[in-house]
Amino acid sequence: MSGRVAVVTGASAGLGAQTARQLAAHGATVVLACRSIEKGEAVAAGIRAQVPGAQLPVLRMDLASLASVREAAARLHDGFGRIDVLINNAGTLTRVRSVSVDGFETTFATNHLGHFALTGLVLDLLAPAGRVVSVSSRASGYRSTTVELADLGFEHREYKPMHVYGQSKLANLLFIFELQRQLAGAGTTLVAAAAYPGVATSDFNRNLGPTARLLSHPALRPLSRLVTQTTEMGSLPSLRAATDPGVRGGEYFGPTGRTKGYPVLHEPSPLARDPELAARLWEESERMTGVHYRFRP
């Protein structure tokens, strides 16, 4: 990764911070894109303590604000001639329905719309042999998970946090697979792939539900080790998708087990591979964000 530029969203904690650490350790310049400059700088300082001389610029970006995403994209254009790797890692889960500054349901705005907009706005910066990686979740394949285009904001459905989160993570996969189809159609060699971390012992996973919270209790750590893994291990699927020279567009990586293990190829739910749904979501995402993709061969 020496000499390459990577952008990691949500790099101020958990899997994002660990992903940035590993990329920096292998010589990449890593842009830490996060809401809090202070938290980002703290992560950068911690990485530099382990990787002296690491190049870790911190970029403020609130994915729930399209204006913030546009400003961050403009700063990337000003500061870098190219981006080799974009890892759309950041994610949130809100327990009570709220809306973003743009009026969209917060989880969907952050997890999907912000990343859709960012990727489109920096597409011209991405190197021909570059990678775009979407970090999804096992929740994308739950039986209850759907993408309801007529009600993406859960205004007319019961607001169940895991259903809301699952929809946003399924949207991540629909987006990245449709992106790969459009890249291939344009004749570009840029690769779009996806990953999920399993169940990593990060602060975020403790918010996913009662089971995850229970497994995070100190008294149950010996039991939790049977089904969870460290953030170091949880970052490996994303890192493989971003750096393995053998990765092909549209591939999806996750742990060997359902929740833990080294990264291997997985097949997502059939819904995630639905090209018609993906195309309709793409059209709706362009309408909601005002970002229209322009592909170059």
Model-derived features: positions:
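Rossmann-fold NAD(P)H-dependent dehydrogenase/reductase core
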Residues: 1-211, 288-296
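C-terminal helical subdomain
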Residues: 168, 220-265, 275-279
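Generic recognition of well-ordered alpha-helical segments
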Residues: 178, 237-240, 284
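Short linear elements at protein peripheries
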Residues: 141, 252, 282-283
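Flexible internal linker/loop segments at domain or repeat junctions
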Residues: 211-221
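A short, mixed-charge helix-start or loop-turn motif at secondary-structure junctions
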Residues: 9, 157, 161, 220-223, ...
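C-terminal amphipathic/interface module of NAD(P)-dependent oxidoreductases
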Residues: 269-297
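Short acidic, glycine/proline-rich loop/turn micro-motifs
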Residues: 99-100, 263-269
